[in-house]
Amino acid sequence: MAKKQKHNTQQRKLIRERDSQKIKDLETKVEEYNPKIAKANLFQDLPISEQTLKGLKEAAFIKLTEIQRESIPLSLKGHDVLGAAKTGSGKTLAFLIPVIEKLYREKWTDMDGLGALIISPTRELAMQIYEVLSKIGKHTTFSAGLVIGGKDVTFEKERISRINILIGTPGRILQHMDQAVGFNTSNLQLLVLDEADRCLDMGFKRTLDAIINNLPASRQTLLFSATQSQSLDDLARLSLTDYKQVGTMEVLNANSSSATPESLQQSYIEVPLPDKLDILFSFIKSHLKSKLIVFLSSSKQVHFVYETFRKLQPGISLMHLHGRQKQTARTETLDKFSRAQHVCLFSTDVVARGIDFPSVDWVIQVDCPEDVDTYIHRVGRAARFGKEGKSLIMLTPEEEEGFLKRLKTKNIEPSRLNIKQSKKKSIKPQLQSLLFKDPELKYLGQKAFISYVRSIYIQKDKEVFHFDKIPLEQFANSLGLPGAPKIKMRGMKSIEKAKELKNTSRQLLTLAKANDEGDVIKENKPEVRTRYDKMFERKNQTVLSEHYLNVTKAQAHDDEDEDFIMVKRQDHELNEAELPELLVPTSKRAQKKALSRKATLASNGNPTKVKFDDDGKAHPVYELEDEQDFRQNGNSEKQKEEFLSKEAELMAKVDVEDKQVAKEKRQEKKRKRLEAMRKEMEADMEDSDYEDEPVAYLGTGNLSDDMQSGADTEDDSQDERQPRKKSKYADSSEDEEEEERTTERDRIIEVEEPQTLEDLESLTANLIGS
């Protein structure tokens, strides 16, 4: 944010009038702009503000790409946009520029709250969007914030109410909607979904639906991805009815060109599963002067391959990245890999979407991706912005035919490569030696084996993935294991639930267990009993046992307790002849039958529940009509439609009531939290002055600086405020002043009011003497 200069009232008035006139002229240009006639090639040809143009120029963004040329004018005019383009085509700027321009033309300030919400499926992509926004928007006065998992929630809560443009992942955004008191989305202008097809799939379905329910329906929505979804259900969830498609034909149409960049050289090799690690190690050894990304299917495999290859020392720097790492480690790895020239990165699909790595030479897919969309996003890490790149995928003989057929539907036909036997090197003996010496490596190998087999088991495309054809023993030997570990396979329902829980915030899962007042009820889990606890809980079985002591104690106090609980008065005697005779079973068989519910029902029949009408006649709870009575009411299809429509109206009415009740509960929770915060602030104000922290505006610094400030705040927030201590040694000047005040007090003479002349004379004499 540029430094503000002080102006007098007249100057400020002129500046406001000038800015208002600029905004009016800009809106006129946007309405009159026709992309078919203008055919803009540069950003300066578009109807955008001077501040945005200045930021784009300083960030070296000058020429427009095809997706930017087609989508930005439509977004500036307020249309909902469904955009798709090849990887590395500049989709990030295609939605960031309309976000800045929309808020600029609306004269958005800090007091207006949240104006734009940008949702990304991964933390790394959200961080990249935040960095680009900081570069191109540093000459504007909007405040931007980044909320992702792995960061201090308290630090984000304190500042989220003053953010104009919020970028984050679905789980953390929903967590702030439930917990942050000042987070208000009622004034939202734009919703942006980057990698929209991933955000709309099953993994984020419930989270995204909950977010959208809290957003106003009058917002503008922008969807961007390299593989776009045109499902009517997905678009209806986002309230998209009248939207504009941009660039989707070349990506989704089967008769169009390939969905991958033209400068990307794609190839594949047929490799048996037990030989994959040998081929991978040999490939890395022969490409030591390259920048490589190696994709594997699970984090366990990434960890195992990284640790084993690191000990084998192929001669190139090795890095690994997966979703189970802490956020600081993931950020450092991304930064190092981006700056390195010759390096190999082992990764899962956590960086398969949207991440812009400079100058990647090779993208290697050791494991077959789950679908063609994942393949397109993986290979899209190379050949970005027209640069050259290469990709290689390893397919087993069982996967080759089916997956190549899937690729052909998108006009992707990779060329087949043959392996030179002279370049191939087996590392199985070295792996067996490493796993024999290091038990931790052996454990990682077992986990990698299990995770790969489970990943094949849960795949939906059974034409490509054949679980029953996996050579388990040979694959285990290729990892250096002495044998194939035993694996327990769960049902598909539990697998889908695990996928859903994987993308759900732990804080949200905790809040789901809260009661109506918002208090989280902690489960009383049994504590772990150690052998020392068991030792102290042992009881004596000899003369020192509890039973023996009770007996001896009772005998010792027999005399004292002689009159305790004695009958003092008898009302009457009970006559056994007057008691009613109960039906007592006469034999064991009758007793067993009386206690058996099944036998009782067999003899007496099932109980029937009836209801009585106004006339007192009994009717069964569920009365079924005869076929003749049913046909008298009309056609069966018509009755079915009437019943469904009636039930649909009832459910819609109940759904509105349920949503209103849920909304009132959320508001009540927020109100209580706000009241608690207000009381806490009032208590703090009595002890010390309140120090407000400034908002982090665009362009205030690097992303790393903003994140470091968040970490510092986290440490500071944990420290308690210490009361101000008095100085151990008093100042000498203070002592002198105290002595002077004491002397003056001693000189004061207290007398009664004089009544006579003699009293006045004595008072005068005393004053003269003193």
Swiss-Prot record:
UniProt xrefs under PROSITE patterns: DEAD_ATP_HELICASE, HELICASE_ATP_BIND_1, HELICASE_CTER, Q_MOTIF
Domain Helicase ATP-binding per the UniProt entry, residue ranges: 72-246
Domain Helicase C-terminal, first and last residues per copy: 276-435
Annotated motif Q motif, positions: 41-69
SUPFAM superfamilies with a match to the protein in the record: P-loop containing nucleoside triphosphate hydrolases
EC class name: hydrolase
Record-linked InterPro entries: DEAD/DEAH_box_helicase_dom, Helicase_ATP-bd, Helicase_C-like, P-loop_NTPase, RNA-helicase_DEAD-box_CS, RNA_helicase_DEAD_Q_motif, SPB4-like_CTE
Biased composition (Basic and acidic residues): 650-667
Acidic residues: compositionally biased ranges: 683-694, 732-741, 751-761
Entry's localization field: Nucleus, Nucleolus
Enzyme Commission (EC) number: 3.6.4.13
Description of how the protein assembles with itself and partners: Interacts with the U3 and U14 snoRNAs. Associates with pre-ribosomal complexes.
The protein's name: ATP-dependent RNA helicase DBP4
Organism encoding this protein: Kluyveromyces lactis (strain ATCC 8585 / CBS 2359 / DSM 70799 / NBRC 1267 / NRRL Y-1140 / WM37) (Yeast)
Gene: DBP4
